[in-house]
UniProtKB/Swiss-Prot annotation:
Residues 165-177 have a biased composition (Polar residues). The lineage of its organism: Eukaryota, Metazoa, Chordata, Craniata, Vertebrata. This is Mothers against decapentaplegic homolog 3. The modification Phosphoserine is found at residues 204, 208, 213, 416, 418, 422-423, 425. The record marks 41 as: Required for interaction with DNA and JUN and for functional cooperation with JUN. Residues 10-136 form the MH1 domain. Residues 232-425 form the MH2 domain. SUPFAM superfamilies: SMAD MH1 domain, SMAD/FHA domain. Residues 271-324 are annotated as: Sufficient for interaction with XPO4. Its main location: cytoplasm. Monomer; in the absence of TGF-beta. Homooligomer; in the presence of TGF-beta. Heterotrimer; forms a heterotrimer in the presence of TGF-beta consisting of two molecules of C-terminally phosphorylated SMAD2 or SMAD3 and one of SMAD4 to form the transcriptionally active SMAD2/SMAD3-SMAD4 complex. Part of a complex consisting of MAGI2/ARIP1, ACVR2A, ACVR1B and SMAD3. Forms a complex with SMAD2 and TRIM33 upon addition of TGF-beta. Found in a complex composed of SMAD3, RAN and XPO4; within the complex interacts directly with XPO4. It is found in: Cytoplasm; Nucleus. It comes from Homo sapiens. The modification Phosphothreonine is found at residues 8, 179.
Length: 425
């Protein structure tokens, strides 16, 4: 490998030789600076040999390699900030790593990032990639009775939802602007995995599907499996009660919806360029405050929403609401710099398996759970002047395609005609 910067120490060259993935010239320079920065820190603490041993042997049974934890948990390398364990795991193991949500520390790691100690371990072999759990197939009895018409779907559009604030126990992330590396998705901020799990999983339904009820034991049971679609969600943008622009189809595991005027791409849905002849002054003012908007992650069968805007976002997620024991229509305020788990595939799978035992209508009602509504800047509900989502100036609706298609297959197996599942707006 040719020297990128003059006077590259031999140890840095050796470590760069183990780098994964191909980068352009600018990115190669940044990688070298990241390695030089780490080498400089480890020389002072005598851990350099252990780093080289871990990288060259690719062995988990190496020691923790630690650097001091900064105040906000991030490491700055050449005007770019990121979480240190993510930076070095991406550099030496997974060049396609998007976020710390994709990493889980090994049990043997004594200074894992999520432990919030004064030192943080950056040994890339002390972390493992979170794998998407395989969802068990739903066993569906084949019914002969086809419903004459679909039951009415629970519709939260015209009721006044309750309001709640960001769940206590989740620390807000530091809201420091960052410059993502070219071709990479930027890391999100600092949230303790332990705290996230403790708070988010409270009240979760039992994740093991219930066995079929005795009444179904003698029926012909057909397994209906979950299939991951090419586009994990579809996003529609609304101003008041009018849909604006085309539906965005998300294929990337991390993408943003923002208020800027850049052309949209697979990782960004930019609302700034969308025109609407009926746009009023209130909508125009709100659009100016969307800013960096919201980042959506789909990782390990879970969906997270992170507020990047300087103003709060407001989320109505029936799946999240069930986890907390709230009313299904509750709207949760997410302050700037915080993120919230808004959907969990395993929880949905358990609910679907239980609902099959309760009949067609119970399964059909889960359609509403696959739709998430989110408003920018202005909230709605009982505590706000605007009491319905269609009264908010700027909002989006997410349709989770995998769960919706799974529902469609289950309903078809139960005896319904094939339908296009959608929410009632």
């Amino acid at each position: 490998m040719s020297s990128i910067l003059p006077f590259t120490p031999p140890i840095v060259k050796r470590l760069l030789g183990w780098k994964k993935g191909e980068q352009n010239g600018q990115e190669e320079k940044w990688c070298e600076k990241a390695v030089k920065s780490l080498v400089k820190k480890l020389k002072k603490t005598g851990q350099l040999d252990e780093l080289e041993k871990a990288i060259t042997t690719q062995n988990v049974n190496t020691k923790c390699i630690t650097i001091p934890r900064s105040l906000d948990g991030r490491l700055q390398v050449s005007h770019r900030k990121g979480l240190p364990h993510v930076i070095y795991c991406r550099l030496w193991r997974w060049p396609d790593l998007h976020s710390h949500h994709e990493l889980r520390a090994m049990e043997l790691c004594e200074f894992a990032f999520n432990m919030k100690k004064d030192e943080v371990c950056v040994n890339p072999y002390h972390y493992q990639r979170v794998e998407t759990p395989v969802l068990p197939p739903v066993l569906v009895p084949r019914h002969t009775e086809i419903p004459a018409e679909f039951p009415p779907l629970d519709d939260y559009s015209h009721s006044i939802p309750e309001n709640t604030n960001f769940p206590a126990g989740i620390e807000p992330q530091s809201n420091i602007p960052e410059t993502p590396p070219p071709g990479y998705l930027s890391e999100d901020g600092e949230t303790s995995d332990h705290q996230m799990n403790h708070s988010m999983d409270a009240g979760s339904p039992n994740l093991s599907p219930n066995p079929m009820s005795p009444a179904h034991n003698n029926l012909d049971l057909q397994p209906v499996t979950y299939c991951e679609p090419a586009f994990w969600c579809s996003i529609s943008y609304y101003e008041l009660n009018q849909r604006v622009g085309e539906t965005f189809h998300a294929s990337q595991p991390s993408m943003t919806v923002d208020g800027f005027t850049d052309p949209s791409n697979s990782e960004r849905f930019c609302l700034g360029l969308l025109s609407n002849v009926n746009r009023n002054a209130a909508v125009e003012l709100t659009r100016r405050h969307i800013g960096r908007g919201v980042r959506l992650y789909y990782i390990g069968g879970e969906v997270f929403a992170e507020c990047l805007s300087d103003s709060a976002i407001f989320v109505q997620s029936p799946n999240c609401n069930q986890r907390y024991g709230w009313h299904p229509a509750t709207v949760c305020k997410i302050p700037p710099g915080c993120n919230l788990k808004i959907f969990n595939n395993q929880e949905f799978a358990a609910l679907l398996a239980q609902s099959v035992n309760q009949g067609f209508e119970a399964v059909y009602q889960l359609t509403r759970m696959c739709t998430i509504r989110m408003s920018f800047v202005k909230g709605w509900g009982a505590e706000y002047r605007r009491q319905t989502v269609t009264s908010t100036p700027c909002w989006i609706e997410l349709h989770l395609n995998g769960p919706l298609q799974w529902l469609d297959k289950v309903l078809t197996q139960m005896g319904s005609p094939s339908i296009r599942c959608s929410s009632v707006s």
